[in-house]
């Protein structure tokens, strides 16, 4: 049995800046504890930063750690892979200690809601099948009505 700690700057995952609206960094937690059924990260969103709109091929669980954030769920309209209409259908506030489950293939965004304070959460990405790769599809959007392309 292995253990790790969610705090500290070690074990950083290289983050593609095109996946976020502002500076964000991720600490890999699953590597040291040898987790094989899920990828686990401590994700830090700088002031006002959010993920871009995206969905995963597996379920995801978020646990609020620091600050105030939100999870926003969107519905897709249209059949094309990119350049489609969207509508926000739910906004869930995430405070320290809150936990939320996001089903696979749910179009969503999450991150900080305060432009003056950071927000962090634990993300547990549950693999769709044992020994499979957890995949995320990222989109450019206006967060209101339109997705313009896959990032």
Can you describe what each PLM-predicted range is?
Residues 26-28, 40-44, 61, 91, ...:
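Conserved hydrophobic/aromatic beta-strand scaffold that supports enzyme active sites
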Residues 32-38, 47-63, 87, 94:
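A short beta-loop-beta micro-motif enriched in histidine and acidic residues
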């Amino acid at each position: 049995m292995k253990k790790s700690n969610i705090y500290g700057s070690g074990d950083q995952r290289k983050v593609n800046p095109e996946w976020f609206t502002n500076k964000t960094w991720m600490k890999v937690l699953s590597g040291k504890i040898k987790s094989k059924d899920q990828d686990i990260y401590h994700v830090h969103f700088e002031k006002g930063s959010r993920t871009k709109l995206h969905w995963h091929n597996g379920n995801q669980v978020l646990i609020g750690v620091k600050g105030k954030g939100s999870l926003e769920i969107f519905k897709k309209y249209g059949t094309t892979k990119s350049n489609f209409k969207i509508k926000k259908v739910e906004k869930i506030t995430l405070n320290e200690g809150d936990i939320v489950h996001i089903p696979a293939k749910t179009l969503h965004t999450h991150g900080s809601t305060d432009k003056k304070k950071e927000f962090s959460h634990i993300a547990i990405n549950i693999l769709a099948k044992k020994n499979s790769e957890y995949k995320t599809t990222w989109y450019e959007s206006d967060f209101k009505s339109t997705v313009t392309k896959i990032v």
